[in-house]
């Protein structure tokens, strides 16, 4: 595995697998045949839009007031990937079930989302590794 391959999802094997499972779910759901696997986006839609798929594992079905998170590796602010849309998913730790939470334009995500500095204790979880922008699942658009 090259550096780009590992840096895309982080170096943890489970995160890499979870990320690719999420991409495959969206490819099947939207009828996309090829994974782009670019640093800034994962897939290209049939309409030519760049899609960044954000998938995390979980222990149970997420609630609408839970957050979707986009981490930033820019230590001084927000690093925005060069994509048109974010699509968020959650997958059970044992991979038995998953949920497509919704989609949002990248610009809208950062306008509506709340920026959280690295090291911030945010209630039930902390942002230890990176700055992040968060947005409640309920703020996402649903696929129809």
Residue ranges and their predicted role:
Residues 1-49, 54-144:
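Nucleic-acid endonuclease domains
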């Amino acid at each position: 595995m090259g550096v780009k391959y590992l840096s895309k999802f982080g170096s943890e094997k489970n995160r890499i697998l979870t990320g690719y499972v999420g991409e495959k779910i969206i490819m099947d759901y939207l009828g996309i045949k090829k994974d782009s696997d670019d640093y800034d986006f994962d897939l290209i839609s049939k309409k030519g839009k760049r899609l960044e798929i954000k998938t995390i594992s979980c222990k149970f079905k997420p609630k609408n007031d839970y957050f979707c998170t986009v981490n930033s590796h820019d230590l001084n602010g927000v690093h925005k990937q060069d994509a048109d849309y974010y699509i968020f998913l959650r997958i059970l730790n044992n991979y038995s079930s998953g949920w497509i939470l919704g989609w949002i334009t990248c610009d809208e995500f950062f306008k509506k989302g709340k920026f959280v500095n690295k090291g911030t204790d945010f209630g039930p979880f902390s942002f230890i590794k990176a700055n992040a922008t968060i947005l409640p699942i309920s703020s996402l658009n649903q696929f129809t």
